[in-house]
Regions:
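Phosphate-group recognition and catalysis centered on beta-loop-alpha active-site segments
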Residues: 1-130
């Protein structure tokens, strides 16, 4: 396939900009559903990162530790999704979203870029879960 045909098949929204970790600011925490909705509302593609929780579920967060975005220590791979949902909130008060919640929110409205975050060699389990 020629380069021109490949480019022609790409969604034009991909070229308008990609909101890194959503379209966030001092009132919307990065990688939160409200930051992703803000990107969607502005017709921007967005990028996010996913980690594998202890129970095999996928959580959206850039860092492997929840401290920077929640203010509370916690290694994602050592916690279950239930523990995270019960005990952690993003700095703006929002829940830390799961991969499934991000997919449901976007519902194919804009293109997304997802980075799989490997922790201590868990790449096979992470790839299977994703």
């Amino acid at each position: 396939m020629s380069k021109n045909k490949i480019v022609a098949k790409l969604n034009p929204m991909f070229f308008s900009g990609i909101a890194h970790r959503g379209l966030w600011n001092d009132q919307l925490t990065e990688n939160g559903l409200r930051a992703f909705q803000n990107a969607i509302d502005h017709h921007l593609s967005f990028e996010y990162d996913i980690h594998l929780c202890k129970d095999g579920q996928l959580l959206v967060c850039h860092d492997d530790n929840l401290k920077r975005t929640t203010g509370k220590e916690g290694i994602i791979e050592e916690l279950t999704m239930e523990e995270i949902k019960k005990n952690y909130r993003l700095l703006d008060g929002e829940e830390v979203p799961s991969f499934a919640e991000v997919l449901a929110l976007n519902h194919e409205q804009v293109p997304m870029v997802c980075e799989l975050k490997v922790h201590e060699g868990n790449y096979k389990a992470l790839a299977r879960a994703a």
